[in-house]
């Protein structure tokens, strides 16, 4: 047996070689939480429990320490790596393994993307008995400094010498003592320590539990969740910090609807989709994609797959602030955007006017988790659908399309592009679209929207004759 390899691994202890008491395990695969998966062997050489090992990679032989035992499986963390994987790499971030923001920095980027592609394929097969006719090339881009949205926890910790501002520690309610972050844009990472110092000076430092940040093309917004009003001295400190770091402060005293800009007032968050000549203003609490560079590529691919023509009528479901709706309106005759949030549909309408495509768009607010075949009928006939649901997926929409197909009572879109942030709900909905609504799964592929995490974003194309 080879010597233990002291590599940087989340949760690992590398005080020395593996002891005789630490069990040894060969890792076969990764699960959806980026844990190594292997099967223990009992004293008779027979397969035993499945072991999920944090910090282990496929192809590795490790020793491990279990922290949760169940009849059929155990959860564990790496103790030592006896045979490292060729996919293992040294994490760039000094706080990896403690901070819960990333789970895959120890895995080569190409391997990260390949594993996510396999997760997508496995979900489609195991949950829906489907294989795509083609697997699209993965969409990927910069792997560092990409995270343009984040929610940071603020905690006054006397034992740490003051205020902490950062992500939670891995599987913990504690806040990581982080002074930089490699996945945040460099200017935001450099702001973490000054932000701590700012909060320490505020009168409400122990009554401000959260800071939400959103990076736009011209300004970075920081939303302070304030449980009590700030005083005049606080206002001065915030203005000075905003001027020094070129940020805009917003205050949120209660729920999301209470968010309002504080200072400065003459700037506006936005992002752009240059390929389609779109400028998209948004509020810092609106849903927008975390990774602006990848979003541009994703929108371009989605529209090329959907292939809208000038005479087409297109339905954009879960349209948000118009991320796909507005580019579609540059190409199609009419685009109807449906979204569950009235706030977001109002923003989408304003954005359509801002970009001069309001003559080709209309928007409505509907609960798409309860939509029926009758609801789709009432909207009229559409040539194509674009569907971009949250993690819960588009079950009601898929069921409604299946019902229409089986009843033969209405036209169905010839093509559907489905953008997913959860491969299991995509697979579930794909099963309905293919097995019950008569579509073919023409292609699918991953979108590496969140490098160094186990999050799997994907895109799929369905067609029906």
Swiss-Prot record:
Superkingdom as given in the UniProt entry: Bacteria
Annotated residues for binding of S-adenosyl-L-methionine: 289, 318, 323, 339, 367, 388
Binding site for [4Fe-4S] cluster: 93, 99, 102, 181
Keyword flag Iron-sulfur: yes
Enzyme Commission code: 2.1.1.190
Pfam families per UniProt: tRNA_U5-meth_tr
Keywords, sorted A to Z: 4Fe-4S, Iron, Iron-sulfur, Metal-binding, Methyltransferase, rRNA processing, S-adenosyl-L-methionine, Transferase
Catalytic reactions on record: uridine(1939) in 23S rRNA + S-adenosyl-L-methionine = 5-methyluridine(1939) in 23S rRNA + S-adenosyl-L-homocysteine + H(+)
Active site: 421
GO molecular function terms listed in the Swiss-Prot or TrEMBL record: 4 iron, 4 sulfur cluster binding; iron ion binding; RNA binding; rRNA (uridine-C5-)-methyltransferase activity
The keyword Disulfide bond appears for this protein: no
GO biological-process terms attached to the record: rRNA base methylation
CDD domains xref list: AdoMet_MTases
NCBIfam families reported in the protein's UniProt record: PRK13168.1 (NF009639)
Function: Catalyzes the formation of 5-methyl-uridine at position 1939 (m5U1939) in 23S rRNA.
Similarity comment: Belongs to the class I-like SAM-binding methyltransferase superfamily. RNA M5U methyltransferase family. RlmD subfamily.
Name of the molecule in the record: 23S rRNA (uracil(1939)-C(5))-methyltransferase RlmD
Organism: Burkholderia thailandensis (strain ATCC 700388 / DSM 13276 / CCUG 48851 / CIP 106301 / E264)
């Amino acid at each position: 047996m080879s010597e233990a390899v002291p590599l940087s691994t989340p949760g690992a202890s590398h005080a020395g070689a593996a002891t005789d008491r630490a069990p040894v395990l060969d890792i076969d695969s990764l699960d959806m939480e980026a844990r190594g998966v292997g099967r223990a062997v009992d004293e008779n050489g027979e397969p035993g429990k499945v072991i999920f090992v944090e910090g282990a990679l496929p192809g590795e032989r490790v020793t491990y320490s279990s922290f949760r035992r169940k009849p059929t499986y155990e959860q564990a963390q790496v103790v030592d790596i006896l045979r490292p994987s060729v996919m293992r790499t040294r994490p760039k971030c000094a706080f990896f393994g403690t901070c819960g923001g990333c789970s895959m920095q120890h895995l080569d980027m190409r391997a990260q993307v390949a594993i996510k592609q396999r997760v997508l394929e496995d979900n489609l097969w195991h949950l829906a008995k489907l294989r795509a006719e083609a697997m699209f090339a993965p969409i990927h881009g910069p792997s560092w400094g990409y995270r343009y949205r984040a929610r940071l926890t603020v905690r006054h910790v006397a034992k740490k010498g003051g205020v902490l501002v950062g992500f939670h520690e891995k599987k913990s309610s504690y806040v990581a003592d982080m002074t930089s972050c490699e996945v945040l844009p460099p200017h935001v990472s450099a702001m973490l320590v000054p932000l701590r110092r700012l909060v320490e000076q505020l009168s409400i430092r122990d009554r401000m539990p959260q800071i939400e940040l959103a990076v736009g093309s011209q300004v970075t917004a920081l939303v302070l969740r304030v449980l009590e009003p700030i005083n005049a001295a606080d206002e001065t400190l915030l203005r000075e910090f905003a001027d020094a770091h070129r940020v805009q402060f917003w205050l949120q005293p209660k729920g999301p609807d209470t968010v309002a800009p504080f200072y400065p007032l003459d700037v506006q968050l936005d992002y752009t989709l240059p390929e389609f000549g779109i400028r998209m203003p948004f509020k810092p609490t609106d849903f927008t994609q975390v990774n602006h560079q990848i979003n541009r590529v994703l929108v371009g691919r989605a529209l090329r797959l959907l292939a809208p023509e000038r005479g087409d009528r297109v339905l954009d479901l879960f349209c948000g602030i118009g991320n796909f709706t507005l580019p579609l309106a540059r190409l199609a005759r009419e685009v109807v955007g449906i979204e569950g949030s009235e706030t977001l549909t109002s923003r989408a309408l304003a954005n359509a006017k801002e970009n001069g495509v309001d003559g080709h768009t209309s928007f409505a607010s509907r609960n798409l988790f309860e939509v029926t075949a009758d609801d789709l009928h009432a909207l009229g006939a559409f040539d194509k659908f674009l569907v971009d649901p949250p993690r819960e997926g588009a079950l009601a929409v898929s069921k409604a399309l299946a019902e229409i197909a089986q009843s033969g009572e209405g036209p169905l879109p010839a093509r559907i592009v489905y953008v997913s942030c959860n491969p299991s709900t995509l697979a579930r909905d794909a099963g309905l679209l293919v097995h019950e609504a008569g579509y073919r799964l023409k292609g699918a592929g991953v979108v590496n929207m969140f490098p160094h995490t186990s999050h799997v974003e994907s895109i799929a194309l369905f067609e029906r004759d």
